[in-house]
Amino acid sequence: PHLLERYQPSLVIIEMGANDGLRGHAPRAIKSNLSTMIQACLSNGAAIALIEMDIPANYGSAYRDAFRSIYRELSDQFDIILIPSVFDEIFGNPQLLQADGLHPNQKAQILIKERVLSTLSKTLQGL
């Protein structure tokens, strides 16, 4: 919070929660943590763009669905920008992953950047 007060950003892009999901944390705890971050940003006057995260399908459909729903629910709850996940494209392509088979590589970062910029530019044009 002190950095928000110090720098007073007009826009904060939040990309968080994937590691918590990969560790099997309860979706409600992940949602609560993200909600706290969003509230801190909003209370300091910043607009929020939340990047939808995903986890691999081998975590099971029930957990994965609960995890994935967090981002839409928070977007609706706080009326913030939701940037759709690009991770389905990344997880399905080994050429876009680091050697660990989990983290996006440099090529994937370009896709993520393009998705973020595309969504933000469309949203800002609509204002």
What are these regions (language model features)?
Residues P1-L127:
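Alpha-helical cap/lid subdomain in secreted, periplasmic
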